[in-house]
Regions:
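N-terminal hydrophobic/helix-forming segments and targeting peptides
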Residues: 1-305
């Protein structure tokens, strides 16, 4: 049974790119509580040396699963100006929340793509990060909330930990704003327990070719193109699994897979994740069937790769 309370609690934690400390601490506490029930107890690497990233090494891995902890959001500039972090949708009057040294903040977003502002009655400290106000909704078919990208990727990776024997599970930072932690994470992995494969546990988009309730998405390409030989292997395994899945072919978008491909290491990679509607808004929406397919697919693939 999925740990929904953990997911709901995690969804309430702010972690705009560059400020992942709180969610990292929350995830690490959960790992330490849950690891006694896992088949294999992993070696845990975390702390200041890893800039809030977390690495779990199970057994003798040949594959690593990556899930980013950060979210999109906004940063306060001068006066009442805001600057996007990552690619949030600009929605006039949407509620934003955060905190500076003077206290809690709840305000509305004003403006459009040409310039965005907040309406908080006092000045907000420069550099303060603001997030969409959270409103979690779940029924028998869907979960809807801000930041399902990539809380559901983290959720899947931690569910996967219960049955892992040989794998790295890595929680990265900065992904929504261009990356930055992956180079040192990959270097550490290849020096400590080298891998040949990387799976990216993240959330993709509902499009004209990808739909709710039709299964987890295996991405053939986004802006970047993984190696066909590895993709064919993943797709063949997925077909044998009997787990519902969809194939994605897009010209845009990216993930931590980009940094795997651009690294100096010969590591194959593939993005596998549930699709969502209302991307980068407070109302991201994912099918529970697709989330279940995502968790099952990762569990299956990690036994076969």
């Amino acid at each position: 049974m999925p740990n929904w309370n953990f997911l709901f609690d995690m969804l309430k934690i702010q972690s705009v790119s560059g400020d992942e400390e709180s969610v990292s601490k929350f995830i690490l506490e959960s790992i330490n509580q849950r690891k006694k029930n896992w088949i294999v107890t992993p070696e845990i690497y975390s702390g200041e040396k890893f800039h809030d990233c977390i690495l779990l090494k199970f057994g003798n891995p040949t594959t690593a699963v990556f899930a980013h902890m950060d979210t999109i959001g906004f940063m306060v500039r001068y006066d009442n100006q805001l600057i996007p972090i990552g690619g949030p949708e600009i929605i006039p009057d949407v509620k934003l929340t955060g905190r500076d040294k003077f206290g809690e903040i709840r305000c509305s977003l004003l403006g459009d793509e040409e310039g965005i502002f907040h309406d908080f009655p006092r000045g907000i400290e420069r550099g303060t990060r603001l997030s969409f106000e959270q409103n979690i909704r779940m029924d028998s078919e869907f979960i809807q909330a801000a930041y399902l990208d990539n809380r559901l990727g983290i959720f899947t990776a931690l569910e996967l930990c219960e049955t892992l024997e040989n794998c790295w599970v890595v929680f990265s930072t900065y992904e929504e704003h261009g990356g930055g932690s992956m180079p040192f994470l990959l270097k550490f992995i290849q020096e400590t327990g080298p891998v040949k494969n990387a799976l990216i546990s993240d959330i993709t988009w509902i499009t004209d070719g990808v739909h709710h309730h039709e299964g987890v998405v295996i991405s053939i390409r986004d802006k970047f193109i993984p190696r066909k030989k590895f993709l064919d292997r993943i797709i063949n395994l997925a077909q044998k699994s009997g787990i519902p899945f969809q194939l994605e072919v897009e010209a845009h978008g990216g993930s931590d897979g980009r940094e795997v491909q651009f690294s100096p290491y010969a590591i194959d990679w593939c993005f596998i994740g549930a699709p969502e509607d209302n991307v980068h808004t407070p109302d991201e929406k994912v099918s529970l069937k697709d989330l279940d397919s995502m968790i099952q697919m990762y569990q299956y693939l990690m036994k076969e790769l």
